Amino acid sequence: MAWTKHQLFLAGLMLVTGSINTLSAKWADNFMAEGCGGSKEHSFQHPFLQAVGMFLGEFSCLAAFYLLRCRATGQSDSSVDPQQPFNPLLFLPPALCDMTGTSLMYVALNMTSASSFQMLRGAVIIFTGLFSVAFLGRRLVLSQWLGILATIAGLVVVGLADLLSKHDSQHKLSEVITGDLLIIMAQIIVAIQMVLEEKFVYKHNVHPLRAVGTEGLFGFVILSLLLVPMYYIPAGSFSGNPRGTLEDALDAFCQVGRQPLIAVALLGNISSIAFFNFAGISVTKELSATTRMVLDSLRTVVIWALSLALGWEAFHALQILGFLILLIGTALYNGLHRPLLGRLSRGRPPAEESEQERLLGGSRTPINDAS
């Protein structure tokens, strides 16, 4: 069945805003500007402040939810139920995981390429599958285990591509390796977040936009408060600011004042995450979970292609191979091969409802699927 203009718009919005989210964060990292007190020109490395901005974008989803709820008042078939009771503190543990994982990923993005960052995030399938078996009592089928193995193989290939690629003075080999490992570590935390959301949040049938906004509120408030002690905690060579501390928000604002384009990149990152979450939820509702996963894979291609075009990274054939293997792993884990096999065997393809149930039940996307 042909897509409507509304569905095409939602798919395009998800693809564009998802790509902007990662690329704008990397664009901000690439800027050089003077900091406070006449400090020398240095790169904009403020991952924790960027994470605060991302949570601000997620927090804005609460406004979208209440707008939808006001619009849906009096409609009996509305999915936005104003009477849904839930305890907001249920979102605190997933929000803490989201805060930790997001901060790690922003630190890693300073060290590695945007395309590797996006591809290595596919590792979440491995840990989600293992944790769902251990803590949710789920039994994985053969195709899901094969998907996990394929994902591991794809991660190895992408890692080899990073090792064999030429590295400039900004991204030394040791930093690239550290960045890649931090991304993998972050996916463990994201997988824990997904398990917590499924165990404690999904059963309350909270609207996804409300869930995203509530987690964003917790993350924004907590991480904003943590910026104060981070200003004084020494981090040595791990730090990217002249004072050598874990985070220097004042230095970041001084750099933004001296290079206004950094503000453009940060605003792009903040706004894109809000629209990306809204578009992703809408695509799953209007089309299918399969479509959302295909678009997410296309997002990786767009990020990789634009990074090459902008000269942010060098071409390496192993990255293509690694991405294809990761794509196969994702497809196997989420059962995307079954409709294809059904058509090849001239069987009746499964209905869209059962497809959504299988995909969302087998591997839920985190409520706030960031960059």
Swiss-Prot record:
Glycans are attached at residue 110. The keyword Lyase does not apply. GO terms for cellular component: lysosomal membrane; mitochondrion. Keywords: Glycoprotein, Lysosome, Membrane, Mitochondrion, Phosphoprotein, Signal, Transmembrane, Transmembrane helix, Transport. Residues 104-160 form the EamA domain. Its main location: mitochondrion. GO terms for molecular function: transmembrane transporter activity. It is a multi-pass membrane protein. GO terms for biological process: negative regulation of mitochondrial outer membrane permeabilization involved in apoptotic signaling pathway; positive regulation of cell population proliferation. Residues 347-371 are annotated as: Disordered. It is found in: Mitochondrion; Lysosome membrane. The modification Phosphothreonine is found at residue 365. The chain crosses the membrane at residues 48-68, 89-109, 117-137, 140-160, 176-196, 216-236, 261-281, 295-312, 317-336. The keyword Transport applies. InterPro entries: SLC35_F1/F2/F6, UCP036436. Residues 1-25 form the signal peptide. Interacts with SLC25A5. PANTHER family: PTHR13146, SOLUTE CARRIER FAMILY 35 MEMBER F6 (PTHR13146:SF0). Involved in the maintenance of mitochondrial membrane potential in pancreatic ductal adenocarcinoma (PDAC) cells. Promotes pancreatic ductal adenocarcinoma (PDAC) cell growth. May play a role as a nucleotide-sugar transporter. Belongs to the SLC35F solute transporter family. This is Solute carrier family 35 member F6. It comes from Pongo abelii (Sumatran orangutan). The lineage of its organism: Eukaryota, Metazoa, Chordata, Craniata, Vertebrata.
